[in-house]
Amino acid sequence: LFLVGNKKTAVNEKIKVDTLLSEIPLIYREDGSATRISMEKFMTDKGIKAKMKLQLTSNEAVKQAVIAGLGLSIMPLIGLKNELEKEDIQILPVKGLPIITNWRLIWLKGKKLSPIASAYLQFVTNEKERINVENFSWINSY
């Protein structure tokens, strides 16, 4: 997760992260969102008292609000590829970021998976390295 702003956002790189995040209202995801949980844990761990400007229910809504100049947010890089390439959004350099998170496949213990779900799980398990290289290697440049 990275701190992002629109292309017009100017941040003094010498400013401390706690000062920055305490003074600039942020755009949050909704309660229960894994992005929000990670974001709030980061701020709690750093002793940062952030101000919430907006709370939105999807990464797409947050992204569009950031592009429109409504504020900054801490967002997952995976959903920002096109906006970074078009320079609609920029990553703001902040000490302590990015926040590294992991994705997991989950299912109910003891539930019999459908043939399609079983095939999908097997495919992802067998092909995860190739999937990562083919689809997400661009992330390494950030």
Residue ranges and their predicted role:
Residues 1-31:
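Flexible hinge/capping segments at coil-to-helix
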Residues 2-4, 25, 72, 90, ...:
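Residues embedded in well-ordered beta-strands
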Residues 18-19, 63-64, 118:
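Alpha-helical segments flanking ligand/cofactor-binding loops in enzyme cores
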Residues 32-42, 46-48, 118, 122-142:
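Ligand-binding clefts/hinges and TM-proximal coupling segments of bilobed small-molecule sensing domains
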Residues 38-92:
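Hydrophobic hinge/microswitch elements
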Residues 90-134:
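A late-sequence structural motif
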Residues 3, 20-21, 39, 105, ...:
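Residue-level signal for nonpolar/aromatic packing positions in well-ordered secondary structure
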